[in-house]
Amino acid sequence: MADYNVSMRDLLQAGAHFGHQTRFWNPKMRQYIFGARNKIHIINLEHTVPALNDALNFANQLASKKNKVLFVGTKRAASNIIREQAQRAGQPYVDHRWLGGMLTNWKTLRQSINRLKDLQTQSQDGTFAKLTKREALERTREMEKLERSLGGVKNMGGLPDALFVIDVDHEAIAIKEAKNLGIPVIGIVDTNSNPDNVDYVIPGNDDAIRAVTLYASAMADAILAGKEYAQSQANAQAKGEEAPAASEA
C-alpha cells in the first residue's frame, strides 16, 4: 500500500459516507449506496476505497511522467482546500469560477493569461508608478480580476492531462469540456450527482470540509510521490551518464 493511499477508517472519520437527503438522490448512483439513515443516503465505502485508490494511483503515474492534473473546486466548501493542495503539489487549479471555454477555447484564454502576466510585470517594474492614479487603479483592478479567474492556470502552459473535480454536478461545464477533448476526469460523486462522463468515479460526500480535505490532500500526496519518483529516475540517469565520463578522464 502506497503512503498516499486512503483507508476505510480515514474515510469514516472524515464523514465521506454521508450522502444527501434521499429525496435528492440520482438513481444512477444506486450501486454505490449502502442504505439510508434518518432520510440520508449512506454511501458504501467498500466501493469508495478501491475507487479512490485507483484514482490516486492513476494521478501518481501521470505525475511520474511529468504530466499535469488540473484541480477543480469552485464551491465554498472546496475552493480554499483545492487551491492549497494544488499549490502544494505544484499543479494548476480553478477555485473561483469556471470560465466557459477554459479548455475548449484554450488559445483565446491564453491571450488573457498573457495579459495577466503583462500586468503583473508592469506592477513590479515601475510602469504603474508612471501612470495617473486613475489609470494605475484601473489596471490594478483588471489585474486582480484576471488573477482571481486565471491565477491558478496561468502557469499551466497548455491543456492538462487529467481533471480532479470536487462535486461533479457543480462543475458540469468543466467535465463536459474535458469529455469533448478526451481528457480523463477524476470526480468525487455524491448521491445526488450524475456519474456520467466521469472516468474515475469516487462515490463520496462532496460537502464536508474534512472529507474534501482528505480527498484533495491524498491527491496532492499521490502527485508529489510521482514527481519524486520522476526526479529520482532523472538523478539516477544523470549519475549513470557521469560515470563513463569520469572513467574516460
Swiss-Prot record:
Belongs to the universal ribosomal protein uS2 family. This is Small ribosomal subunit protein uS2. GO terms for cellular component: cytosolic small ribosomal subunit. It comes from Acinetobacter baylyi (strain ATCC 33305 / BD413 / ADP1). InterPro entries: Ribosomal_uS2, Ribosomal_uS2_bac/mit/plastid, Ribosomal_uS2_CS, Ribosomal_uS2_flav_dom_sf. GO terms for biological process: translation. Signal peptide: none annotated. Keywords: Ribonucleoprotein, Ribosomal protein. Transmembrane segments: none annotated. GO terms for molecular function: structural constituent of ribosome. The gene is rpsB. PROSITE patterns: RIBOSOMAL_S2_1, RIBOSOMAL_S2_2. CDD domains: RPS2. Pfam families: Ribosomal_S2.
